[in-house]
Amino acid sequence: DECSAKVLAHLYSELPAPVFQLRPREAAMIKYADNAFHAVKVSFANEIGRFCKATNVDSRIVMDVFIQDTKLNLSPYYLKPGFAFGGSCLPKDLRAVSHRAKQLDVSLPMMNAVIESNQEHIRHALEMVREYGRKRIGVLGLSFKADTDDLRESPMVSLIEQLIGKGYEVKIYDTNVTLPRLMGANKEFIEREVPHIAKLMCLSVKELLEKTDVVVVGNRGKEYESIFREHRNGHRIIDLSGIGEAKDLNLDEVKYEGICW
């Protein structure tokens, strides 16, 4: 209750740390998340160490430099629940380490499980769509992050491919993706994974809404926030990116569900 919260806040007020007032279930889960993450960090460092030793690399030097990066490596970055990772770097480099470790007979169970965990997250998104029982699915955001046209190993492309394979009618809009402009490996990837993508693309959010019943938001492109104002009654919105966190959006008027919230 509010009175107890004030008493506890006063007791801890001298400590150089913020005080959060939460429900007991979130407070308890934070402890589990803390300790699970610490265990993951220990296991990660040890797996890097085993791999480094097998390749004649000094893991102490590697990790001493690794921890200097407080923008990405040791930071809040990548630590918010959302959709699966993708792009031209993370999947490729993780597979490279895993492949080389197998050649050297070095066991890296945690890193080997990361790709499968990522695929499971894509399957989870597919199951969320399936549970609505609608066949006309719109996808906002084809690339793995906002403000890029890089489609290589985008988890959204994988999700779309699986939806099409299961007979869903898919429409796509991405403000950054113009098919005639795609080049090289990027163009080859999307044409291989979704051969008829040109027929699926819409020219605007409005057009996509007119042709679909369920909308999946794949990245946090600013333009996609308009779905919370322009949606038709009955639209379901599945948020994979956290775009619904924007302060000026009214989620009370839409049928909205986040992938992890």
Regions inferred by a protein language model and the residue ranges of each:
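Structural/interface elements that position substrates and couple domains in central-metabolism enzymes
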Residues: 1-261
